[in-house]
Amino acid sequence: MKAYTIHVTGIVQGIGFRPFVSKLAHELELVGTVRNDTNGVEIYIQGMEKSCKDFVGRLQSDLPLHGRIDTLQVETAELQRLESFTITLSQGAKGNAFIGADMAPCAACLEEIQDSKNRRFQYGFTNCTNCGPRYTIIESTPYDREKTSMRIFPMCKPCQEEYEDLQGRRYHAEPNACDQCGPEFSLKHMDGTVIASGMEAIELAKYHVQQGSIVALKGVGGYHLVCDALQDAVVQKLRLRKGRPRKPLAVMAGSLETAKHYVHISEIEKEVLLSPARPIVLLRKITEYNTDSIQAKTNATFERDIVYKDVSKIHQKQKITNEEYPVAYEQTVDKTMVSPRLPIAPSVAPGMNTLGVVLPYAPYHYSLVPTDALWVMTSANRSGDPVLYDDVQAFDELAGIADYILTHNRKIISPVDDSVVQVVNHKPIMIRRSRGYVPISISVVALDTSPTMLAMGADMKASFAMNRKSHAILSPYMGDMEHQRVQELLWTTTNRYEDLFQLQPSQVVVDAHPKYYTSQCGRAYAEKYQLPIIEIQHHHAHVGAVLAECNIDAPVLGICFDGTGYGTDGTLWGGEFLYCHKSYMERLAHLSSAPLPGGEIAVREPWRQALWYVNQLYPDAPPKVIERWKESLPKGWQVLEKMLPHMQMIQSSSGGRLFDTVASLLGLGHVHLYDAHLAIELEQMALSEVGDILPMMMDNHVLDSMTLVRSIIKELERGESVTKISADFHKTLIYYIGEMAKRCCEERHISHIVLCGGVFQNRILLEGVMNELDEYTIHIPTESPMNDGGIALGQLWLGSQMQR
């Protein structure tokens, strides 16, 4: 007879690890205990030596689906008088617990909520040890029900029995609940008056969406605005009310099959769509509908829900023949027909060849969104603000935007926005890392011997990070730091991470930009706690994030194209070719610099920099195509034109600004309506054409933007189409980035290349440059965002390198 104490750290709380341990111990006829603590999980086993060894081996080989073991320490222990194996109360002590992310319903839970004979039929908060909420409901560790927002919902007898059933998948499932004891929905008017509760609230909300109303929905990590994506009038109404005139809206498809009617879905994209994280996935639209999918075969029939104002009749069905279908949607009084045979509203994603699609990721989505429906599911917050999650605030801010609010009484402890992913060259690329991914840590070997650091990230797409030894824990996407609420959320979430993960930073890492709010906060934090501070150049941190993910120790050429970043020479960078090795960085080449007339306002109004280019190229007599272009500019452009020769302007080598300039010259717009708006539309224009390489000078390690802009204007003079010029611009930039990269690699004997920065979210550019440089080993970020959301990870990695 032997006895052992086993300490396990990693993602071992909130994923069914203790029930797994208990079942395994019973199977091997071991006695003992298992409990959570803030380090992870502590196990005591007692039994035959072979059984104990088998137990330790299977802890690792049979680990639950969403778990991860980082360390496993086995120590000999004293024998005790025990008769069984039990899950005991958790123990609180400072330590190393990791927390799992929120997960979409598992197959077993889905089967229950879709089974009319099951007691959880259509229950919107169904979960088990394999799925459901985690990060958004946890107040503190160890992970027990009384330390979550579920503590106010005592379990009923059947739920308690499930919780205690060793063989069941709800054995010690902390959020376990049913419609008799758990959270419930209520549908309310915007003045707070309750209209309906429970399942009736969900069905009535569905009815109102199908009728053309806008409903605010309290989700897993915050509020969404929901409307029918097939009704253009209501989508336009949503845009008008929210003040979001152009930015593409994400949609939720009721099923994968419904999504396939509107977008192309590869096998990898399908895997991402159906993953437990359930992010929004950017997918290519089907521009021409297959007639077989629009019209069913002759005499075919199908069922639809008939939703009456008397919701007691909600489940009645009606048969409609194919011949009746074309008029059925328009002529039924309630207008509830929602079918994949109808086209998507043009105003959902105007001018876009892609569509952001998410599948149902909470149990209530399966009751709310019909399987054949396509609904707008967009965050209810203002652009750049953090996700809206407070109930009182939601009523205040959504009055005048939403017609109704579908809310529930489970408190959101930690808000999270939807994550966004796109697949490029068969690899999922992270655009926004939030729900479903945070707070899962990223393993970074180089951090193993580093002290705990706080990396503040950047001001755009803000996300900070902390590390515990070799694990980087990134915060959710928070928004842009120009908004006060994001600034407040930064401090709130930083304090929360320190408490939740029991971390106390001993160093602070910030962006070198002296005016970044995040950098100022980091300096204030360091001063408050008397900590050393490390400054990291912005684009070096972009490269560092990829080095952290890929564990690269060799020298690399970092090609970083983004919107802006403070350079070592005091100008703004953003079109960079950097030699990077460990903590060393050297600028080898870059895009040529151009001024930003008016400073920050020129970022929002790209016509200003475009006007500078035009006046440099044609100081006396511009071609007629440019004269016509000037006539399209906002009022007051003549004043700026006269001032240009006398203005002191900051210089920028930004690739993002070059995209904006070309978009303005092509007439796609002169002012950004949302972040990267014009660059995105320029990419969309290029998708339908095959580009040619235009003249662009490459001299003395500088790619000359001026000659490329001249080439663009020459094409306009020749009457080339906007789509063709857009494709030519992309093709040219791809070619010359490749040529400059090859020159740099040859000169410095480099075989590894890193592609990073927000501009490389452009699928054409990223795929093109990867193909152009296929003779090298190419590295791109996949676990952290390509944009500034990944900066904090790079800051952590470089901070650790600078201490070696």
Predicted features, each with a name:
Residues 62, 162, 371-447, 647, ...:
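Internal gly/pro-rich beta-alpha loop/helix module
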Residues 216, 502-514, 533, 749-759:
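Short glycine-rich phosphate-binding loop at a beta-alpha junction
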Residues 511, 530-542, 751-753, 763, ...:
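Conserved phosphate-binding/catalytic loops in two-lobed NTP-binding clefts
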Residues 1-175, 179-186:
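Intrinsically disordered, low-complexity, mixed-charge
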